[in-house]
């Protein structure tokens, strides 16, 4: 299945690359990023330090380190926007973070990528507004990359239902 919605732990997915919702400094944090950094181990932070950061709406890729034991090859660090009311280019920046993550995955030979819901935690992006952007961006990318499979890994049943409704409306 090219696009799948699941409820679960993003750090335990059978995929080639796991996307983390990073901050611009790429230095690890709470939420999904903290989970991925803990699962990948301290070498992830050592690998990301020299990069120094990346702008909102972009992504960078590193080895998966300790996640490689589960078959994950890469961690893709996507920087989504902080929600500021929706009139500051947030939708374009969010789509860019998804698109750049997918591009990096394909460029590095990944056949499967797992995403969290980027920017909907501490960055405050409303889930019902983020879901259609995420799913439309992913589906658009998959049209030109049919061999790629994408798994949206959502934390909690409420988030899963929001994404299921958004997918049904696309």
Curated annotation (Swiss-Prot):
Annotated disulfide bonds: none
Entry-linked Gene3D superfamilies: Leucine Aminopeptidase, subunit E, domain 1
Domain of life the protein comes from: Bacteria
Domain (Macro): residue spans on this chain: 1-170
UniProt-listed SMART domains: A1pp
SUPFAM superfamilies: Macro domain-like (SSF52949)
Pfam families reported in the protein's UniProt record: Macro
Annotated PANTHER family: GANGLIOSIDE INDUCED DIFFERENTIATION ASSOCIATED PROTEIN 2-RELATED, MACRO DOMAIN-CONTAINING PROTEIN
Similarity-based family: Belongs to the MacroD-type family.
Full protein name: Macro domain-containing protein DR_2288
UniProt organism field: Deinococcus radiodurans (strain ATCC 13939 / DSM 20539 / JCM 16871 / CCUG 27074 / LMG 4051 / NBRC 15346 / NCIMB 9279 / VKM B-1422 / R1)
The organism's taxonomic lineage, starting at the top: Bacteria, Thermotogati, Deinococcota, Deinococci, Deinococcales
């Amino acid at each position: 299945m090219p696009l799948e919605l699941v409820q679960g732990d993003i750090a335990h997915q059978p995929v080639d690359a796991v996307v983390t919702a990073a901050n611009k400094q790429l230095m690890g944090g709470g939420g999904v990023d903290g989970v991925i950094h803990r699962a990948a181990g301290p070498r992830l932070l050592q690998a990301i330090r020299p990069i120094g950061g990346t702008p909102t709406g972009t992504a960078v890729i590193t080895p998966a380190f300790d996640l490689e034991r589960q078959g994950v090859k890469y961690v893709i660090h996507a920087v989504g926007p902080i929600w500021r009311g929706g009139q500051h280019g947030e939708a374009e920046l969010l789509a860019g973070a998804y698109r750049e993550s997918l591009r990096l995955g394909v460029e590095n030979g990944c056949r499967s990528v797992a995403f969290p819901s980027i920017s909907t935690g501490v960055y405050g992006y409303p889930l019902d507004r983020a879901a259609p952007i995420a799913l439309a961006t992913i589906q658009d990318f998959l049209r030109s990359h049919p061999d790629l499979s994408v798994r949206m890994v959502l934390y909690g049943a409420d988030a899963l239902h929001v994404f299921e409704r958004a997918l049904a409306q696309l």
